[in-house]
């Protein structure tokens, strides 16, 4: 029961970032592999190769911020812990493992250093976590990584 409540809280936090940020970047080994952006009144989903060449573009017609948040949540759960999410315009709102990311207009990721991360919020944590800007709290993903998470 607690895992389910925690999952719902995480989805709520991610949805808040989707609504307030406008762009979400999904990173694997610090390389952007996907982007979800709100453009022209709908969500667009882009995928990229390692050189950041566009592989595909999809219009997510009819998708809501909650649908997008659930999609991002599922991506987090299914991917290794060294993957990261960037959200913002152009400030970082979600970050993992003390790594904080901004992007320039070419969507090249620029790693920021300690002085920047300390200005965003608490930056020392061991578990992969989401920092929710709405309720200004950390929500660790480790609470929901157990095999019986979906029971």
Curated annotation (Swiss-Prot):
Q: Please give the Gene Ontology molecular function terms for this protein.
A: metal ion binding
Residues the record lists as binding Zn(2+):
102, 109, 132, 135
Q: Which UniProt keywords apply?
A: Early protein, Metal-binding, Zinc
For whether the record's keyword set contains Ribosomal protein, the answer is: no
Necessary cofactors: Zn(2+)
Keyword Zinc recorded: yes
Which parts of the sequence form the motif Thioredoxin WCTKC motif?
Answer: 131-135
Q: What induces it?
A: Expressed in the early phase of the viral replicative cycle.
Q: How is the cofactor bound?
A: Binds 1 Zn(2+) ion.
- Source taxon at top rank: Viruses
Q: How does it assemble?
A: Monomer. Homodimer. Interacts with protein B119L. Interacts with membrane protein E248R.
Family statement: Belongs to the asfivirus A151R family.
Function noted in UniProt = May participate in a redox cascade for the formation of disulfide bonds in viral proteins.
- Provide the protein name: Protein A151R
Identify the species of origin: African swine fever virus (strain Badajoz 1971 Vero-adapted)
